[in-house]
């Protein structure tokens, strides 16, 4: 009855087959848990809706049984006797107001307001942070794959060094630094609380992320090399500047397309992450300053580009953006 009042289980109602909801609710008491072996408890723990009148040692046993079934377990508690189960759980949650010092020390998280709804908000925040870390790592690695390919393959095509060390450092500062800041505060995915917990053994590049990172990096490198080669073999002196600038534009558009794994930027809205939008504009402005301010262009050893050349470099970024957006559509 208490579980129904708290909303843990539904109120009694008719169910298919003539059973009522009360008979479909499975509960275990501490006495029943005591009579079960660990293997028996493990076999039934997934089916139990309510655990009632359990002692601290029973809580520990329940946590261990759930973990043995491969679940990620969060345990709440406020007393000294809850400490073993709090410590054993993947996430121990202690009460900040009613909790004892021992329970707080044994926990990973403390609810300052003793409100269980705060746990849901904390889970969402944690998943969002993890998602954003994955997005940034994939974005950064893909961009670096592109730059490495440019540096490694260009000499085999009969060209001098395509990028100077200072230019590489500048690109990394703009992309990993400024764009990374914007990606770090991305909003949560729409389905973030409908997903199953991430497995502790799952890597950053799992679920196809590694494959996507590689092909995006190869695409960036191939586009920059193709553009630079066209300008080089047609005798254009600004071929290095075209590689340098196209890489900057491609990573700006790559960052915008990397905001969500499923949703299009047009659905999200550019200004739904104002920091990233601002950083993208800042990166473009800084890159243009390097091209057109004589002191900076001399320092970075680049040549000013014509309007046509600048649009050509920007079109490489638009191409990367279009391909990444189309991939999301086909995945759906």
Q: What are the language-model segments listed below?
A:
Residues 2, 62-63, 89, 106-107, ...:
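Short beta-alpha junctions and helix-cap segments that line functional grooves
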Residues 122-332:
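C-terminal transmembrane helices and immediately adjacent loops/tails
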Residues 1-65, 69, 76, 83, ...:
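Cytosolic catalytic headpieces and adjacent flexible linkers of membrane translocases
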Residues 76, 80, 84, 103, ...:
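Acidic (Asp/Glu-rich) catalytic motifs at the cytosolic membrane interface
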């Amino acid at each position: 009855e208490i579980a129904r009042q708290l909303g843990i289980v539904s109120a009694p109602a008719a169910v298919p087959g003539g059973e009522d909801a009360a008979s479909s609710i499975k509960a275990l008491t501490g006495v029943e848990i005591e009579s079960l072996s660990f293997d028996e408890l493990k076999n039934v723990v997934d089916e139990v809706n309510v655990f009632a009148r359990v002692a601290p040692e029973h809580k520990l046993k329940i946590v261990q049984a759930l973990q043995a079934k491969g679940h990620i377990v969060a345990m709440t508690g406020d007393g000294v006797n809850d400490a073993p189960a709090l410590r054993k759980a993947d996430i121990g949650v202690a009460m900040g107001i009613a909790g004892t010092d021992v329970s707080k020390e044994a926990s990973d998280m403390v609810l300052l307001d003793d409100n269980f709804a705060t746990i849901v908000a904390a889970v969402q925040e944690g998943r969002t942070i993890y998602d954003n870390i994955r997005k940034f790592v994939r974005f950064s690695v893909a961009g670096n794959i592109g730059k490495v390919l440019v540096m490694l393959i260009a000499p085999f095509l009969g060209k001098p060094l395509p990028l100077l060390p200072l230019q590489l450092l500048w690109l990394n500062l703009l992309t990993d630094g400024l764009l990374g800041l914007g990606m770090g505060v991305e909003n949560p995915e729409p389905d973030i609380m409908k997903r199953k917990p991430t497995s502790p053994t799952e890597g950053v590049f799992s679920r196809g992320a590694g494959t996507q990172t590689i092909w995006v990096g190869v695409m960036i490198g191939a586009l920059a090399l193709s553009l630079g080669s066209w300008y080089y073999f047609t005798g254009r002196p600004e071929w290095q500047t075209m590689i340098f600038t196209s890489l900057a534009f491609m990573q700006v558009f790559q960052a915008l397309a990397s905001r969500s794994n499923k949703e299009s930027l047009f659905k999200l809205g550019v200004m739904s992450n104002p920091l990233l939008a601002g950083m993208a504009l800042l990166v473009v402005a800084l890159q243009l300053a390097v091209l057109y301010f004589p002191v900076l262009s001399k320092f970075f050893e680049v040549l000013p580009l014509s309007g046509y050349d600048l649009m050509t470099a920007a079109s490489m970024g638009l191409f990367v953006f279009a391909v990444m957006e189309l991939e999301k559509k086909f995945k759906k």
